[in-house]
């Protein structure tokens, strides 16, 4: 039972801020709090010990211009810096279920051509909030090894962690249109001026919200053998009808990779993971027609460091693109940095 509860809390310290689409509307941060190895079974605690909180951050730098997957010149130096901070509050109901609320705070700085002029600005505010249910679908632990410490009259039995564990969690949820979607109104006023440089940053890239109720479906798996581990995350967003006649396409994000715990003690964990992340998103629709500059398929590689001490858990990682296949003209990511810190009460 204890190990199931631990997995509900750690098989999430990946900032799933799962891979994000071209407009950088990142997935839900689900802290993998299993690394909080010092936790005890909730059955021996008060009801409030089921609560946990987290803060996740994703920073993405967009400064490379591509047309249909090919890099082209960026004579105007257009770019977008996107920061998405997610505030997370959750409660572990029992050994199988946990509820989680995600509230994103977004800040975006940009520079783009607008006709023959240069438009600089910022956009900030509340994004689209999400309510998630996490369900442990499967969990297995090998028999724990037991040793005896002989230091007095009576030997003391010490039970060690299992050498092998495997767990799978299902993720279901609903995203609410709490973010301001007024930037989408720009789509009504866009015109091409002959001879003027083209912009790869539009209202759908800067909007704080999609204006739609969306379904969230995903899975997270965690496998460990002694100090070697493997984690995977998949998140699919089923988009509803948006506002301003603009409808975002469904998107799929995934991540995973092997890692190694250099330190794994009862109260302290430090590990390094080689992470591969990817995303797929079809083109959006505006006024019933395809918005050609919104589709993307990408793969990123990078390291991720995870650590925990008692009830605290943290992670940080960097991702660099190895393949980006986009539609039409877009400003695509140069790199992405993720981080998070979580606490189980």
PLM regions: where:
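Repeated loop/turn-to-beta-strand initiation elements of outer-membrane beta-barrel proteins
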Residues: 51, 63-64, 96-101, 139-143, ...
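Outer-membrane pore/translocation modules
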Residues: 108-249, 308
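Residues that define the transmembrane beta-barrel architecture of outer-membrane proteins
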Residues: 49, 81-85, 123-131, 164-166, ...
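Transmembrane beta-strands of outer-membrane beta-barrel pores
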Residues: 57-63, 103-109, 137, 174-180, ...
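Outer membrane beta-barrel transmembrane domains
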Residues: 64-68, 72-75, 242-345
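Outer-membrane beta-barrel biogenesis signature
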Residues: 19-65, 141-166, 180-182
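Surface-exposed strand-loop-strand hairpins of Gram-negative outer-membrane beta-barrel proteins
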Residues: 59-84, 187, 202-205
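Residues on the lipid-exposed face of transmembrane beta-strands in outer-membrane beta-barrel proteins
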Residues: 43, 55-57, 87-91, 101, ...
């Amino acid at each position: 039972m204890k190990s199931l509860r631990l997995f509900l809390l750690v098989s999430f310290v990946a900032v799933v801020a799962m891979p994000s689409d071209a407009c950088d509307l990142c997935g839900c941060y689900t802290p993998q709090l299993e690394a909080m190895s010092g936790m005890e079974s909730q059955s021996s605690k008060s009801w409030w010990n089921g609560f946990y909180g987290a803060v996740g951050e994703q920073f993405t730098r967009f400064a490379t211009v591509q047309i249909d997957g090919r890099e082209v010149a960026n004579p105007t130096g257009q770019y977008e810096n996107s920061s998405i901070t997610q505030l997370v509050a959750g409660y572990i109901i029992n050994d199988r279920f946990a509820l989680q609320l995600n509230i994103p705070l977004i800040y975006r700085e940009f520079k783009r051509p607008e006709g023959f002029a240069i438009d600089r600005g910022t956009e900030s505010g509340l994004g689209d909030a999400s309510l998630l249910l996490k369900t442990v679908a499967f969990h297995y632990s090998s028999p724990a090894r037991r040793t005896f410490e002989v230091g007095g009259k009576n030997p003391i039995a010490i039970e060690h962690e299992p050498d092998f564990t495997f767990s799978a969690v299902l993720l279901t949820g609903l995203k609410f249109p709490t973010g301001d979607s007024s930037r989408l109104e720009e789509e009504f006023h866009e015109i091409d001026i002959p001879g003027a440089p083209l912009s790869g940053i539009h209202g759908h890239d800067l909007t704080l919200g999609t204006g739609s109720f969306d379904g969230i479906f995903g899975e997270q798996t965690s496998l460990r053998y002694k100090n070697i581990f493997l984690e995977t995350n998949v998140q699919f967003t089923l988009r509803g009808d948006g506002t301003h006649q603009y409808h975002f396409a469904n998107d799929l994000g995934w991540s995973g990779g092997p890692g190694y715990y250099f330190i794994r003690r009862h109260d302290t964990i430090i590990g390094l993971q080689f992470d591969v992340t990817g995303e797929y998103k079809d083109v959006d629709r505006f006024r019933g027609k395809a918005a050609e500059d919104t589709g993307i398929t990408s793969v990123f590689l990078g390291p991720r460091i995870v650590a925990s001490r008692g009830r605290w858990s943290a992670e940080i990682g960097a991702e660099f693109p190895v393949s980006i296949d986009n539609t039409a003209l877009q400003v695509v990511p140069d790199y992405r940095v993720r981080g998070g810190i979580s606490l189980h009460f």
